[in-house]
Structures are given as C-alpha cells and as structure tokens.
C-alpha cells in the first residue's frame, strides 16, 4: 500500500469532504422556519439516540406540551395568578424547572421502553387494545387547543402511549421488590400560626412576644392578638421538608395540639401556636409525595445503570425548540369553559 496519496486520490478526498460539508449544511437548513413545518421537522428529528435506537422530537414535544396544558388548566381553574416566567430558584423560572423535570422523565421513558423491547416485555394483546382505546379517546375527547398545541395525530399519540405503557411495565418490575415504606415522622405536617417579631421592625420584641403568649394562653386568638401589636400571625403547615429556618421547623414540630410557645432565633422572637400536631389530610398528601419521590429514585438509579452500558446521545439543539412561549390555555379560555 502506498504511503502517500496521489493527485487523483487527493482530488477525490477533497470532493468527498466537500460533499459531507454540503450535506451538513443541508441538514442544518432542515430546521423549521415557522410553526407550519415544525411538525414535519420534529417527526424526522431524533431527540435521543442509543445505539441503533432512537426517539423522535415529536414524541418529546407531545409529552411536554401536554404537561404545559395540565399546569395552565390547573392554575387558571383555581384562580391562581400564573406566569411561566416567575423566578423560582437560583435564577431559574417556573418554565425552566418544569422543562428540566419533563426532559428527565421523557429520557427515562425512552430508555425503559427500549429496555422493555430488548427484554421480552412487549405489550400483551390486552395492553395493546388498551393503548388503542386511549388513543381513540384522546383524539376524540381532547380540547381542540390541546390537539393543536401538541400537534397530535393518531400515529403520534399511538407511539407515545405505546412507549409510556412499556415504561410503566418496566417501572412495575423495578418497584416490585423494593422498600416503599415512608416513615410517618418524615411525612407528618403540623398546622401552626407563627408571629415573627424582629428587632428591625419592633421595639422590645421579647416583651411583645411574652404579651402575645400570655394573651393566647388566656384563650384569645393568636391572629387577633398579633394585630394589636401591628404584627401578623401566618398560618402554615410545617413538615421536615418545609423551607424555613431549621431551628424554627424543629420547634414547630415539637408542639402539641393547642400549645403555644415562644422561641428566640438569632435575635428574632417567634410566637408559635399549634392548631394540629398532625394535619392528617396534608400529611397524607405529603406521604404520597415522599412515596413518589422514593419510587422515582429507584427508577432513576435503574436508568443510570443502563446508561452506563448504553449511553444516550441527546440532541440539545432540537430540545431547545421546545418551550412554553405559546400558551395552550389562557385564563380566558378556562373562565369561558366553566
């Protein structure tokens, strides 16, 4: 074999390189210029690739826009002021957080649905019939705004529902023999009223705290007593995961029903009245959240192990086309439907 290329080989090599470059430019130009051709673009563009397996962008788009619709309908139904651009934490907006969580979920759906097919966990005839029924129901019963926003078609919905059914099947297998108990103390939510008295806003906050405590222990309502001193009694549920000062949290959780006490933390005085040491309804909801988090941790760990053997390639450029710039529902849509 010759060590160096001759002139003809060099020309051929340059032609091949040019062709590859042109193809790359053509592929880049396939990206949608407007909403009209986005459905076609998303159908032909892979969002995830794992070996010879892939998931197209339209499936991820469908799942994400459905989630957007759910949140918008929920918040507008209950009259809550709502914006996707609300800052939440560390410079991120509500939209950022929902997109991140949804992206992780979609990636896990992809990995586990492919795992199911590779491990003889395909859907049974009954499960396939259930998918077909759900697809039909979605296409005939969904609000037209959801159909439009998700760019739904029978084929797309069928692909997504098949994937999520396979995902559910694997999740059931993962969770079959694991510990899914929740410590009651981890879930317990007490219901308290807290009066905060900072020396920045109150003269002699320690004396005010003592006076409020004395009045409450004499049978007066903490909210009414607090207003006498131009203070406010904030009524909240407190549990182990509540985002308040740790010392204050521990103090609240130590109180019994109808107990009122004061505590000083870093020069700030707090008067805390406990309505319920265990708000059962809220505790039940907190327990469900902890249970779902525990399930999610097992599933995520399983997916991460699979990814060590078969890494997932992510098309970040394609994912960046998915956002909540266009609402599925507006406040007016929900008001008119009620």
Predicted features and spans:
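Extended intrinsically disordered, low-complexity coil regions enriched in Ser, Thr, Gly, Ala
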Residues: 122-129, 185, 190, 195, ...
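Short loop/turn hinge sites at secondary-structure boundaries
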Residues: 79, 215-219, 258
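N-terminal targeting/tethering segments
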Residues: 35-152
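Extracytoplasmic/secreted proteins, especially bacterial periplasmic and envelope-associated proteins
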Residues: 55, 59-62, 93-102, 106-114, ...
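Peptidyl-prolyl cis-trans isomerase
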Residues: 210-249, 281-282
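PPIase-associated folding chaperone regions across multiple families
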Residues: 2-5, 9-43, 146-210, 243-338
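A generic structural-conservation signal
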Residues: 125-127, 235, 261
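Sec/Tat-exported extracytoplasmic proteins
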Residues: 64, 71, 106, 110, ...
